[in-house]
A protein has these predicted regions:
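Short, well-ordered beta-strand elements
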Residues: 28-40, 58-64, 131-132
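A conserved helix-loop-strand patch within extracytoplasmic ligand-binding domains
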Residues: 105-154, 258
Length: 274
């Protein structure tokens, strides 16, 4: 009798170990990534990638943010595996300011910035002394000023790094444009809707999130050609070699996702690989 009890106990132990082994094996097969993103278009693009990643054994959790500060803090605090909301100059500025040890794991798309106005239908119509409202994100100032220089409204000093230019680098301003830069980027669409200022510079993601059409509503749009403001997947240094991160970037750069971006946003968002 004791012999049978011993055999029964041994069998139960073996079955339990086998079940644990299967459980551990299942855990190994499904890897989870937590990615922080802006609502539009970043989170929408990630949602499109979700089923593709699932087929590759990766469970994607998307955490959305309404500003440009918290996603990097959350990444630094290891609350996220990656974030997808910022362009390269902004990442570099944030790393310098806060000491973040991040890297660019891959570029995904470009969001051409637009000039919006309730009062005027073209840049040429802007009057002398027109008030130009832009975000308080210094990393976007060079981008905005470079666009306005390209459109012939101002001239920047020779030799200045266009991605880091400030209003102090303006050497010619024939319309005497007045620049205001004290508004959070996410609030700019409301500033435009309230008819404040003569022109408002709005990033495409915030324009889309506010129900604007970045391909039709602006009176002028930044050129996507040779544009350094590529929105990227940012990770902590060292994580760029993780298989899950590499797979995430590969999927987001795939033809399926590129085609989705082109069809969904109709030129307001452009795949970086195009």
């Amino acid at each position: 009798m004791k012999k049978w009890i011993s055999l029964l106990v041994a069998a139960v132990v073996i079955l339990a170990l086998a079940a644990c082994g299967k459980s551990e094996s299942a855990k190994e097969k499904t890897n989870k990534l937590v990615v922080g993103a802006s609502n539009v278009p970043h989170a929408e693009i990630l949602e499109q990638a979700k089923p593709i990643l699932k087929e590759k054994g990766i469970e994607l959790e998307i955490v959305t943010f309404q500003d440009y500060v918290l996603p990097n803090k959350a990444l630094a605090d290891k609350e996220l595996d990656a974030n997808y909301f910022q362009h390269i100059p902004y990442l570099e500025a944030q790393m310098k300011e806060h000491g973040y040890d991040f890297v660019n794991a891959g570029g995904i798309h470009i969001e051409p910035i637009g000039v919006y106005s309730k009062k005027y239908k073209s840049l040429e119509e802007l009057p002398n002394g027109a008030k130009i409202i832009m975000s308080n994100s210094v990393a976007d100032h060079g981008r905005i000023l470079s666009m306005l220089e390209e459109k012939g409204l101002i001239k920047l000093k020779d030799g200045v790094d266009k991605t880091k230019a400030t209003v102090d680098d303006i050497v010619e301003n024939p319309k005497n444009l007045v620049f205001e830069a004290d508004v959070e980027a996410g609030l700019l669409p409301q500033v435009y809707k309230n008819n404040e200022g003569d022109a408002v510079l709005i990033n495409a993601n915030y324009a889309l999130d506010a129900g604007l059409d970045p391909a039709k509503d602006p009176i002028a749009v930044e050129s996507p050609e040779n544009n350094p403001y590529v929105n990227i997947i940012a990770v902590r240094k060292g994580d760029e070699t993780r298989k899950e991160i590499q797979t995430l970037v590969e999927v987001l750069q795939s033809k399926d996702i590129q085609d989705f971006i082109l069809e969904k946003y109709n030129g307001a968002v452009i795949p970086a690989t195009k």
